[in-house]
């Protein structure tokens, strides 16, 4: 969290370099800019949100350490654990809105927060698989992780692959069917513009490869195959984050 807070501070301090709409709002002050695009409000909510998440997770770790000491400690740990998913989803949604969706002030998607959360959580699972594999293969864990555990990881990766493509297609289909220029211009520009390679690579790495391979039990029971799929998911998610931010200017640009 300290590193995340420092990176957040750097992004917020960059102003127009991080949020291109700041320059446009200054040059065209007479144009309507949603209240959500108030820079002071943005900085305050992002900083307070990060602090709130840090505090909740700090309490979670402290109570987890003594959760087996007594029934009361177990209950206190359970209570704070119930708040962690809410904090993660709410703050994750705000990050999705501030750093991606609203980069183009006129563009909105009701499902974007959920799609962003599911995508990033899938990447977290993929990172966890690789991290455990790296530590386990080098004998760095106090208790080695058995190979059958990777099958459970593979099933979770498969589930979040399906959830991701569901939310992705739900958003894409709604925008395509509505056919409103203010909504379609951003998606079609990323799909057909200079970022088209990254766009289609994202779909291949985040859906085609995981869905195709993890559908077969031998792959799910293979440690190396599961780790390879996890690597594809991480790269695909990085492509996804890049194309949504970098492609905001009509899908035109170098990368």
Where are these regions (language model features)?
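Interfacial loop/helix-cap signal at membrane boundaries in integral membrane proteins
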Residues: 18-40
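Long, contiguous internal "core" modules enriched in hydrophobic/ aromatic residues
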Residues: 34-202, 216-219
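Short, membrane-exposed interhelical loops at transmembrane-helix boundaries
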Residues: 184-191, 246-255
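Core segments of transmembrane alpha-helices
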Residues: 203-211
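Transmembrane alpha-helical segments of integral membrane proteins
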Residues: 210, 239-250
């Amino acid at each position: 969290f300290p590193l995340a807070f420092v990176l957040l501070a750097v992004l917020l301090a960059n102003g127009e370099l991080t949020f291109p709409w700041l320059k446009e709002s200054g040059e065209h002050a007479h144009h309507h800019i949603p209240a959500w695009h108030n820079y002071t409000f943005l900085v305050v909510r992002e900083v307070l949100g990060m602090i709130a998440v840090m505090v909740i997770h700090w309490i979670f770790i402290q109570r987890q350490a003594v959760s087996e000491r007594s029934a009361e400690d177990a209950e206190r740990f359970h209570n704070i654990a119930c708040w962690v998913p809410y904090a993660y989803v709410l703050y994750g949604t705000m990050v999705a809105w501030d750093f991606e969706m609203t980069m183009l002030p006129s563009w909105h998607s009701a499902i974007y927060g959920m799609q962003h959360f599911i995508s990033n959580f899938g990447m977290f699972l993929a990172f966890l698989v690789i991290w455990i594999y790296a530590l386990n293969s080098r004998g760095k864990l106090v208790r080695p992780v058995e190979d059958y555990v990777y099958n459970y990881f593979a099933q979770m990766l498969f589930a979040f692959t399906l959830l991701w493509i569901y939310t992705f297609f739900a958003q894409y289909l709604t925008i395509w069917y509505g056919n409103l220029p203010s909504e379609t211009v951003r998606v079609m520009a990323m799909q057909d513009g200079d970022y088209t390679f990254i766009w289609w690579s994202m779909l291949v790495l985040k859906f085609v490869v995981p869905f195709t391979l993890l559908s077969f039990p031998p792959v799910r029971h293979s440690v190396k195959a599961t780790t390879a799929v996890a690597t594809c998911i991480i790269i695909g998610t990085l492509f996804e984050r890049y194309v949504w931010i970098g492609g905001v200017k009509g899908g035109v640009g170098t990368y």
